[in-house]
Amino acid sequence: MFAENNRISWSQMHCQCLLAALGMGLIWGIPEFTGREGAVGILIGGVLLVLWSGILRRQMTVFRDPIRYLGKVPAWLIAGIWESYLVLTGGWLVGKVGHLAGEYLVSGVPETLLSLIFVLAALGGSHHVQARGRLAQISWGVAAWLGGILLLLAAVQNSPSLEMVWGDQHLETTGFDWKRSVKSIGKYVAYGSGIGLMTWLTVQVRDSKEKRRKEGLAPAIGQLSLWFLTGAVLLTVNFGTDATTMNTCPILEVMAGVELPGGFLRRVDLIFLSILLFSLVFLLGSIFFYSNYVADRIHISIGRL
């Protein structure tokens, strides 16, 4: 059904998932998962997402031709739900990025103009399945290494606070809020609900000689959960559970206090922000891509705008 040169590998699928989720998760997601309750929510929520991704992967045959296996009305209904999800997410994202860039990157520029530039940058990316896979594979390697090193520096420089907040003495004197933990599980599962879109694209993942353990989205979900957990711990160390009430971006406030060895670069937060903004551009590009791709799967042609 698909030409071999129009397929991607599981590794490229993982990189697309991680690159698209990283920016939004670290900027707006992790403040909801501070404290031990948030950490438990991430871990249990990650397990639930892995189980759900396994169920979705078994539906690959159905999504090769939804109209054939489900019928026209059910296929259109499912596609309509996902299209609504993409439109709402895209609109929310464009507004948030305009505000973020105006506050942290360039001041004095109208947020509407910044949002427009963001949209044009996302539209300028490749819309071809295989090209997007290669772009994500290369970009994720750079983003993961650079972002990981900066987060590691932040953790090392906050190590005394880490011991104080997560030490045994603190755990003994603080109760565990199970109700908040359950809410965190629900929030994390809701955040990861977008993996359902990957089901539409897995039909174009080629059957190669990759090891079975690389198939499916479980490795990507596991890595993403580690990123969330690291960011949430750093926010807990610096702001406690008050990160959700902050008017600023908590993770960027943490990175603003990070100093590189030798002190040759003082604005580490701008490097970290650049990584996250690139992730957000890729995410919006993915929204445009899937809005057209899902429609194509049910034999409807729509413009990207």
Per-range role (PLM):
Residues V97, A101, E111-T112, G124-A154:
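Membrane-interface loop-to-helix entry segments
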Residues P74-E83, S139-A155, Q223-L229:
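Small-residue-rich segments of transmembrane alpha-helices in multi-pass membrane proteins
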Residues F63-V73, V129-A136, V205-A218, D296-G303:
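Membrane-interface helix-boundary motifs at transmembrane edges
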Residues N6-W28, G41-G45, L49-S53, W82-L86, ...:
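Hydrophobic, membrane-embedded alpha-helices of multi-pass small-molecule transporters
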Residues N238-D269:
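Membrane-interface interhelical connector segments
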Residues M24-E111:
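Membrane helical hairpin/interfacial module
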Residues R57-V62, L123-Q130, A154-N158, T202-K209:
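Structural signal for the C-terminal ends of transmembrane alpha-helices
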Residues M1-V40, G125-A136, L252-V254:
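N-terminal hydrophobic signal/anchor transmembrane helix of membrane proteins
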